[in-house]
Amino acid sequence: MNIAVAGIGYVGLSCAVLLSTHHSVRSFDITQSRVDLINAGKSPIRDVEIEDALAAGTRINASTDPQEAFTGADWVVIATPTNYDPDKNYFDTSSVEQVLRQVQTINPDATIVVKSTVPVGYVEGLTSEFPKLSILFSPEFLREGNALRDNLHPSRVVVGF
Protein backbone atom coordinates (compact mmCIF):
# COMPACT_ATOMS: atom_id res chain seq x y z
CA MET A 1 0.00 0.00 0.00
CA ASN A 2 1.25 3.48 -0.84
CA ILE A 3 0.61 6.22 1.69
CA ALA A 4 1.24 9.95 1.46
CA VAL A 5 1.47 12.20 4.52
CA ALA A 6 1.02 15.95 4.08
CA GLY A 7 2.76 17.90 6.84
CA ILE A 8 5.80 16.56 8.68
CA GLY A 9 5.47 18.13 12.10
CA TYR A 10 4.76 16.10 15.25
CA VAL A 11 1.50 14.60 13.97
CA GLY A 12 2.51 13.93 10.38
CA LEU A 13 6.01 12.66 11.05
CA SER A 14 4.92 10.30 13.82
CA CYS A 15 2.24 8.89 11.49
CA ALA A 16 4.75 8.57 8.65
CA VAL A 17 7.28 6.73 10.82
CA LEU A 18 4.64 4.39 12.22
CA LEU A 19 3.11 3.64 8.81
CA SER A 20 6.53 3.14 7.19
CA THR A 21 7.11 0.01 9.26
CA HIS A 22 4.75 -1.82 6.87
CA HIS A 23 4.16 0.52 3.92
CA SER A 24 5.89 2.87 1.53
CA VAL A 25 5.35 6.46 2.71
CA ARG A 26 5.87 9.67 0.78
CA SER A 27 5.82 12.77 2.95
CA PHE A 28 4.95 16.20 1.63
CA ASP A 29 5.86 19.50 3.25
CA ILE A 30 6.26 23.05 2.00
CA THR A 31 9.46 23.57 4.01
CA GLN A 32 12.54 22.38 2.11
CA SER A 33 14.71 22.14 5.25
CA ARG A 34 12.28 19.63 6.84
CA VAL A 35 12.22 17.58 3.64
CA ASP A 36 16.03 17.58 3.46
CA LEU A 37 16.32 16.38 7.06
CA ILE A 38 13.84 13.53 6.55
CA ASN A 39 15.62 12.39 3.38
CA ALA A 40 18.92 12.46 5.30
CA GLY A 41 17.45 10.22 8.03
CA LYS A 42 17.22 13.04 10.57
CA SER A 43 14.24 14.42 12.43
CA PRO A 44 13.12 18.04 12.18
CA ILE A 45 11.36 17.66 15.55
CA ARG A 46 12.52 16.69 19.03
CA ASP A 47 11.28 13.16 19.70
CA VAL A 48 13.84 10.53 20.67
CA GLU A 49 11.87 7.59 19.27
CA ILE A 50 11.31 9.33 15.93
CA GLU A 51 14.98 10.35 15.80
CA ASP A 52 16.02 6.74 16.47
CA ALA A 53 13.62 5.33 13.86
CA LEU A 54 14.81 7.75 11.17
CA ALA A 55 18.46 7.08 11.99
CA ALA A 56 17.85 3.32 11.73
CA GLY A 57 16.26 3.76 8.30
CA THR A 58 12.64 3.95 7.19
CA ARG A 59 10.63 3.64 4.01
CA ILE A 60 9.89 7.38 3.99
CA ASN A 61 10.73 9.69 1.12
CA ALA A 62 9.96 13.38 1.52
CA SER A 63 9.26 16.01 -1.10
CA THR A 64 8.06 19.58 -1.54
CA ASP A 65 6.36 18.52 -4.78
CA PRO A 66 2.71 17.53 -4.25
CA GLN A 67 2.62 15.73 -7.60
CA GLU A 68 5.48 13.49 -6.49
CA ALA A 69 3.97 12.89 -3.06
CA PHE A 70 0.32 12.24 -3.95
CA THR A 71 0.52 10.41 -7.30
CA GLY A 72 -0.32 6.74 -6.81
CA ALA A 73 -1.09 7.03 -3.09
CA ASP A 74 -3.88 4.78 -1.84
CA TRP A 75 -4.24 6.91 1.29
CA VAL A 76 -3.37 10.54 1.99
CA VAL A 77 -3.01 11.61 5.62
CA ILE A 78 -3.38 15.36 6.13
CA ALA A 79 -1.51 16.62 9.19
CA THR A 80 -0.91 20.24 8.27
CA PRO A 81 -0.91 23.05 10.85
CA THR A 82 -4.23 24.69 11.68
CA ASN A 83 -3.25 27.46 14.04
CA TYR A 84 -6.01 28.92 16.20
CA ASP A 85 -6.83 32.56 15.50
CA PRO A 86 -8.22 34.15 18.68
CA ASP A 87 -9.42 37.22 16.76
CA LYS A 88 -11.60 35.10 14.49
CA ASN A 89 -12.24 32.48 17.20
CA TYR A 90 -11.49 29.83 14.59
CA PHE A 91 -8.77 27.53 13.30
CA ASP A 92 -6.94 28.48 10.09
CA THR A 93 -7.83 25.45 7.99
CA SER A 94 -6.48 26.85 4.72
CA SER A 95 -3.57 24.38 4.64
CA VAL A 96 -5.98 21.42 4.88
CA GLU A 97 -8.08 22.83 2.05
CA GLN A 98 -4.98 23.47 -0.07
CA VAL A 99 -3.94 19.81 0.25
CA LEU A 100 -7.48 18.66 -0.55
CA ARG A 101 -7.46 20.73 -3.75
CA GLN A 102 -4.09 19.23 -4.69
CA VAL A 103 -5.25 15.66 -4.04
CA GLN A 104 -8.50 16.30 -5.93
CA THR A 105 -6.44 17.33 -8.96
CA ILE A 106 -3.59 14.83 -8.68
CA ASN A 107 -5.17 11.69 -7.22
CA PRO A 108 -8.94 11.91 -6.59
CA ASP A 109 -9.20 8.15 -5.97
CA ALA A 110 -7.10 8.28 -2.79
CA THR A 111 -8.83 7.95 0.57
CA ILE A 112 -8.04 10.97 2.74
CA VAL A 113 -7.61 10.96 6.51
CA VAL A 114 -7.61 14.37 8.19
CA LYS A 115 -5.45 14.35 11.34
CA SER A 116 -5.15 18.14 11.65
CA THR A 117 -6.95 19.89 14.49
CA VAL A 118 -10.19 21.20 13.00
CA PRO A 119 -13.50 22.53 14.38
CA VAL A 120 -16.39 20.19 15.15
CA GLY A 121 -18.35 19.48 11.97
CA TYR A 122 -15.58 20.73 9.70
CA VAL A 123 -15.06 17.45 7.82
CA GLU A 124 -18.79 17.15 7.18
CA GLY A 125 -18.60 20.51 5.42
CA LEU A 126 -15.66 19.27 3.37
CA THR A 127 -17.71 16.42 1.97
CA SER A 128 -20.05 18.91 0.30
CA GLU A 129 -17.17 21.09 -0.93
CA PHE A 130 -15.23 18.06 -2.23
CA PRO A 131 -18.03 15.56 -3.06
CA LYS A 132 -15.84 13.25 -5.16
CA LEU A 133 -13.26 12.73 -2.42
CA SER A 134 -13.47 10.07 0.28
CA ILE A 135 -12.61 11.98 3.48
CA LEU A 136 -12.32 10.56 7.00
CA PHE A 137 -11.37 12.26 10.26
CA SER A 138 -9.14 10.78 12.94
CA PRO A 139 -8.15 13.27 15.66
CA GLU A 140 -4.70 13.17 17.17
CA PHE A 141 -4.03 12.85 20.89
CA LEU A 142 -0.26 13.31 20.92
CA ARG A 143 2.18 14.93 23.29
CA GLU A 144 5.16 16.75 21.81
CA GLY A 145 8.28 14.71 22.42
CA ASN A 146 6.22 11.50 22.76
CA ALA A 147 4.36 11.54 19.46
CA LEU A 148 5.50 8.15 18.17
CA ARG A 149 4.91 6.47 21.53
CA ASP A 150 1.43 8.02 21.74
CA ASN A 151 0.64 6.73 18.24
CA LEU A 152 1.86 3.25 19.15
CA HIS A 153 -0.04 3.22 22.46
CA PRO A 154 -3.10 5.46 22.03
CA SER A 155 -5.25 6.28 25.02
CA ARG A 156 -8.27 6.19 22.69
CA VAL A 157 -9.10 5.74 19.00
CA VAL A 158 -11.70 7.94 17.30
CA VAL A 159 -12.51 7.84 13.58
CA GLY A 160 -15.42 9.49 11.80
CA PHE A 161 -16.63 10.88 8.53
Regions found by a protein language model. Give the residues of each.
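N-terminal Rossmann-fold NAD(P) dinucleotide-binding loop
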Residues: 12-13
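Conserved N-terminal Rossmann-fold NAD(P) cofactor-binding segment
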Residues: 2, 24, 30-75, 82-90
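Glycine-rich Rossmann-fold phosphate-binding loop(s) that bind the pyrophosphate
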Residues: 8
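Short beta-strand and adjoining strand-loop segment in the mid-core
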Residues: 117, 148-161
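Redox-cofactor binding/interface segments in oxidoreductases and associated redox assembly factors
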Residues: 76-78, 114, 159
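Rossmann-like NAD(P)(H) cofactor-binding subdomain of soluble oxidoreductases
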Residues: 84-146
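Aromatic pocket-lining residues of Rossmann-like dinucleotide-binding sites
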Residues: 19
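Conserved hydrophobic helix-helix packing surfaces used for dimerization/oligomerization
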Residues: 3-5, 112, 157
